UniProtKB/Swiss-Prot annotation:
GO CC, one annotated term: extracellular space
Assembly information from the UniProt record: Monomer. Interacts (via C-terminus) with CASP1 and CASP4 (via CARD domain); these interactions regulate the activity of inflammatory caspases.
Family: Belongs to the serpin family. Ov-serpin subfamily.
InterPro entries reported for this sequence: Serpin_CS (IPR023795), Serpin_dom (IPR023796), Serpin_fam (IPR000215), Serpin_sf (IPR036186), Serpin_sf_1 (IPR042178), Serpin_sf_2 (IPR042185)
Assigned keywords, A-Z: Cytoplasm, Protease inhibitor, Serine protease inhibitor
Region CARD-binding motif (CBM): start-end pairs: 352-382
Taxonomic lineage from the root: Eukaryota, Metazoa, Chordata, Craniata, Vertebrata
Gene Ontology biological process terms in this record: negative regulation of interleukin-1 beta production; regulation of protein catabolic process
Subcellular location field: Cytoplasm
Top-level taxon of origin: Eukaryota
A molecular-function term among this protein's GO annotations: serine-type endopeptidase inhibitor activity
Protein name per UniProt: Leukocyte elastase inhibitor B
Amino acid sequence: MEQLSSANTLFTLELFHTLKESSPTGNIFFSPFSISSSLAMVFLGAKGSTAAQLSKTLHFDSVEDIHSCFQSLTAEVSKLGASHTLKLANRLYGEKTYNFLPEFLASTQKMYSADLAAVDFQHASEDARKEINQWVKGQTEGKIPELLAKGVVDSMTKLVLVNAIYFKGIWEEQFMTRETINAPFRLNKKDTKTVKMMYQKKKFPFGYISDLKCKVLEMPYQGGELSMVILLPEDIEDESTGLKKIEEQLTLGKLHEWTKHENLRNIDVHVKLPRFKMEESYILNSNLCCLGVQDLFSSGKADLSGMSGSRDLFVSKIVHKSFVDVNEQGTEAAAATGGIIQVLCEKMPTPQEVFTVDHPFLFFIRHNPTANMIFFGRVCSP
């Protein structure tokens, strides 16, 4: 499980770097867990260099028995009885006249609980698209109403792999609505906008990364299994969002070091955090190509013969949509996918800290028992 957690975190950071290249100062929000689960289902049917590229990019080559690990991780992350709702769902939509290998269908069912729904892409692709969107909408409590835009599937489509994830968590320490006020949020050194700024003073795990002049705050959700971790520079020091230095330093080792419990102190913190809501949509083909997955998208090169026995399948698009809403009560989020470690240098202990999120920040929602990042985001304009 630890190997898979490290593999997923590495992939998260690498994917984030490709997303910020096309959006240097924009908001970013995605579910790495959803994307890697979806690609793991593709990997199940991939062979040759297609499989090798997927394995290398997703760092599956460092994980023993990858599909069993995903099976255990999914069961652990979405187990019932928790005080939050975290729902994961996988489904395959296949052209009804196409012969998929029974072994492939049995494996996706066993490892990913993904059923095959037979649809008529050939003669009724628009109906199939609507059916897929309707299913995703239901799985994400209506937050992702249209995963697939018109024209994304057509009569040539053979297979659509869908992964949907929905999360709703209540803060362990909720903000009081009466404390929320209008306040300025600095987008960069020059521009500001007015946001709804929430406030509370409670004990939270807090840390400080001195060489980056960056504060770290962990805000647990009820039950403690999931937390939101926020990385906030003390100030905007570059000519952009103020996040450049942190983003350049983001590595698996450093992120683990900065945010692990032993390096955070539980102290009184005055937290000011804006309410924010984001909806993002990505077609990930070019991002994954940049990271080394190339054959998968090419009709002449893709080898998905583990799915069908022949080499006529390829992936035309990987679509990912995500939604997050952070407010006084907690967080609602959904998504669907079609170096040298430096120890924290603590500041002199003070009885309380101020954590005012009035400029761009990074955050992620982590499943603590498995150390897996379920969602990752950058807020430049709440």
